[in-house]
Amino acid sequence: METYGLEKLGLVNAGAVYRNLTPAQLVEHALRRGEGTLSNTGALVVKTGKYTGRSANDKFIVDTPAVHDDIAWGKVNRPFEKAKFDAIRAKVLAYLQGRDVFIFDGFAGADSKYTKAFRIVNELASQNLFIHQLLRRPTAEQLRDFHEDYTIIAAPGFKCVPDIDGTRSEAAILVDYEAREVVICGTQYAGEIKKSVFSVMNYVLPKQGVFPMHCSANIGKNGDSAVFFGLSGTGKTTLSADPQRMLIGDDEHGWADDSVFNFEGGCYAKCINLSPEGEPEIYNAIRFGALVENVVMDPDTREFDFDDASLAVNSRVGYPVEYIPNAELSGMSPSVPKTVIFLTADAYGVLPPISKLNRDQAMYYFVSGFTSKVAGTEIGVTEPVPTFSTCFGEPFLPLDPSVYAAMLAEKVEKAGARVYLVNTGWNGTGKRMKLSYTRAMVTAALTGDIEKGEFVTDPTFGVQVPTSIEGVPSELLIPANTWEDKAAYEASCRKLAQSFAENFKKYTHMSAAVVAAGPKA
């Protein structure tokens, strides 16, 4: 039986070994093995059990001399002993002995100058389907000559024993940059595999002069590209799926000297409250070949109830970018971005729904990475919680924030890009901003129409706020207008401004000009 080189990993006695099966074959295997069921649209539907989001506290980086000085150690990048990693790795390989395994050999990085080859070894056919659709798929010729740069082993059925293994729980995501391996066990949430690829790219690309970004990206009809930064649940996927523009990708990109390129070949979209009216591109992508996680489905009709959050608020669907009608299949833009948008979901209700930033403000708000944790994207988050995530992607950034901030500054300046802060969160009415209004504001920024009107300076945040945008009620553009209680509004402004200032104290490397660009408490 062909083993496709698994013995190099130490996996010498697997059951059947399948490599780069088609989606149809993987769906057949998943159904036969009882991993999921089919929906009335043909999508494969699975329940991931206990873990329905990323388990951020269970991720560790192996601390070796070769990488020690590179990593920004702390609450996000937790060190793990090499010997303990090797012990868990050996146990996982022993666990996989005699079991069928599914291999996907593919790529991250659409720009061939920066492409990395990944081998993903899965215990589950459904997870292999997911990563087949999310990464960049090889041609027959590429598969024949394939040599992996990195290997990820995902064995959800293997549970760690914290007292013995040195982990925090039964789940662990262990990244060994020096050995070029990742081991994922105890969690079936497929997003862990995708984000492990992202963490690797965030480590290696800055060394090649490429700025790795937790962002979505699209291209206008004139070839003008735009990038949208933001944490999970702030609207990256939704706002970049624009019928008037070509989608490059929805989550992970690199900004090189002459292009923006997608790391992936697929999308991973939230499903909660999904509707054909609100997000038709995503809704219509839920078909055969897509993997749906934790969406409630009628057992008889097999119809979805996207409004039912009883399985998870963070319900998801993974599908290839080809399922989006206006996708840019090359995964690249012909030019560097002219528009940069920072997305945030402000639970305080005081940030303007859209504002323009100068260079120092762009640095300040990028490094701050303010948003509110939105229910369900991490274990234990059920209500919006104001939070700061460095560079809008702290959980995935192994290097010091100053590395990524300096790269953004350099790229924005070189491209002459305009930077906007867009609040997709709440206002003084206690309601979240309507998607149609946010779309109108983003469109005005992308077309340049926003620059034709007047701007006023926000007294607390110092940003430039437009006074009118077509398709948006003017009273919503100025946050104070949405609050009946002006004293409460001002108190909330002060509270958020103080949070910004307190958070920014840890960035001792930033210039005085950037520090001064923050809100006035």
Q: What do these predicted ranges mean?
A:
Residues A155-V204:
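Charged, amphipathic alpha-helical linker segments immediately N-terminal to NTP-binding catalytic cores
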